[in-house]
């Protein structure tokens, strides 16, 4: 099965329909890019290899950026590197960012970690977020076995 490449006009139509410049979603995506840059810098400093994953990888390949309606970033790394990064991020002295996981928030139930802004805002109301210590957009970090 071959994937049809979208033309620039098709990409722009999708962006305009689902995600115009200045929209809340587009602003969140720009915030996520800054967060990805921060994590990429930390990984580079500590020789941690990572890859784009899931919808983020699909968006990069198909849309040359985000899938227009995507509201998170997904990365993956080997489990041993995830454990190292988790230690680093849990000890990160940052006023801006936090690593959200079970160790930093007893109410957090996901099996993966989220790199978040400390002062993030919630766009989607959900009871599961009511108990979270930190909210808002996040960069999902997954671990895989070799």
Predicted features and spans:
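Active-site nucleotide-donor binding segment shared across nucleotidyl transfer reactions
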Residues: 40-73, 82
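Short hydrophobic/aromatic beta-strand micro-patches
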Residues: 76-78
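Generic secretory/membrane-interface signal
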Residues: 4, 66-68, 108, 134
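Conserved catalytic core of two-metal-ion nucleotidyltransferases
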Residues: 12, 16-44, 89-146
């Amino acid at each position: 099965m071959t994937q049809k490449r979208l033309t620039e006009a098709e990409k722009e139509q999708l962006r305009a329909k689902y995600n115009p410049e200045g929209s809340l979603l587009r602003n969140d995506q720009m915030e996520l890019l800054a967060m990805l840059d921060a994590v990429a810098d930390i990984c580079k400093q500590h020789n941690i290899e990572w890859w784009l994953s899931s919808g983020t990888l699909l968006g990069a390949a198909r849309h040359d950026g985000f899938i227009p309606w995507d509201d998170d970033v997904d990365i993956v790394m080997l489990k041993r590197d995830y454990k190292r990064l988790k230690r680093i991020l849990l000890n990160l002295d940052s006023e801006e960012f936090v690593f959200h996981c079970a160790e930093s928030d007893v109410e957090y139930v996901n099996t993966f970690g989220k790199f978040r802004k400390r002062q993030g805002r919630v766009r989607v109301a959900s009871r599961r977020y009511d108990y979270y210590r930190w909210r808002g957009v996040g960069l999902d970090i997954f671990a895989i076995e070799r």
